[in-house]
Amino acid sequence: IPDRVKLDEKEATFFIQDIYEGEGLKGIPRGTVKALRLHAYEYAYLKTTSDHNWHGIQSGWDIKRILGTVPVEEDGSVMFKAPANTPISIQPLDKDGVAVQWMRSWVTGQPGEIVSCVGCHESQNQVVIPKRVIASQKKPASLTLPEGGVRSFTFDLEVQPILDRACIACHNGEGKAFDLRGGKKDGQGYGTSYLNIHPYVH
């Protein structure tokens, strides 16, 4: 069997024939998904307790970093290049950049490998759909890097500056408005603003 990897390359190619196929986006109207946001995973920080509550309330177990986005074609197909030997999860995004689903598992491509699937968590017994799709007639898309570059993200770095700029004039710990100031942390490292805003954001 010929080797499908090219060890001198640093990227793999990923191809999805129709993102609306399968259980992953069941019930999502065609045309909703405009792009995919790709995340990679990081190792847990040194001496981190083996408990997802140390990463965030109701969050995943993993520390993530944003790699970027790639466009989805009108017919639901997508093909893109992404770093090889890197666990990647995928978020389908709507026209406003809002995630309509989250891939809870991950996929990894070897250098130079082409990784393909029919859709989003389609049945393992489903065969390729016999049709030509838009993405297969183009070169693979390159990642559009996120604002600020490839990086991990945290509440303190991404959300707290917005609260400081737009909210704490009223939500300053005085009166009836709940406190959205940053800085103070509890025993698990959660700030006052994080704990107060969490019940309203899921």
Q: What do the predicted segments below correspond to?
A:
Residues 15-27, 168:
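Short amphipathic, basic-aromatic surface patches that mediate peripheral association
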Residues 29-58:
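Extended low-complexity, serine/threonine- and proline-enriched intrinsically disordered segments
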Residues 3-4, 24, 32:
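Non-globular targeting/processing and membrane-anchoring segments
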Residues 21, 75-77:
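Short beta-turn/strand-loop junction motif enriched in small, turn-promoting residues
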Residues 27-35, 85, 173-175:
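Short coil-to-beta strand junction motifs in C2/discoidin
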Residues 1-12:
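Catalytic cores of secreted or luminal carbohydrate-active enzymes
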Residues 7-9, 29-31, 63-65, 83:
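Short, surface-exposed loop/turn motifs at beta-strand boundaries within globular domains
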Residues 52-54, 60-74, 81-119, 124-202:
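Solvent-exposed helix-loop boundary motif
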